[in-house]
A protein has these predicted regions:
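Positively charged, small/polar-rich N-terminal and surface patches that mediate targeting and assembly
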Residues: 1-112
Length: 112
């Protein structure tokens, strides 16, 4: 089992959600976050003064998936979230030691 964490542009969330649902992913967690990478930030004018905006709005999504669909899901996220411009984001894949469904007590892949 793997935990996929992806940082994407906010306007890509619905497309990514649909793409992974089409593969069979039944659950996703999305969080509004701020960050920067190579994109850095940008400057804005406010009341005649220039300000540097370092942190840009992004969306972090987290999905627990079975190893059997890992590559499909990662590929779907990358292809769907890509705009070809700086700031498209990143995908991180981590091992999951255990998953427990609180309601039923199911564990492992059955709990995903």
């Amino acid at each position: 089992m793997k935990l996929i964490t992806a940082i994407i542009k906010p306007f890509k969330l619905d497309d990514v959600r649909q793409a992974v649902a089409d593969i069979g992913v039944q659950g996703i967690t999305a969080t509004e976050v701020k960050g920067f990478g190579r994109q850095r930030g940008h400057t804005e004018l406010y009341r005649g003064a220039e300000y540097v905006v370092d942190f840009l709005p992004k969306t972090k999504i987290e999905l627990a998936v079975d190893d059997s669909i890992l590559e499909q899901v990662v590929e779907a996220i990358v292809n769907t979230a890509r705009t070809g411009k700086i700031g498209d984001g990143k995908v991180f894949v981590s091992n999951l030691e255990e998953v427990i469904r609180i309601r039923t007590g199911e564990t492992g892949a059955e709990a995903i």
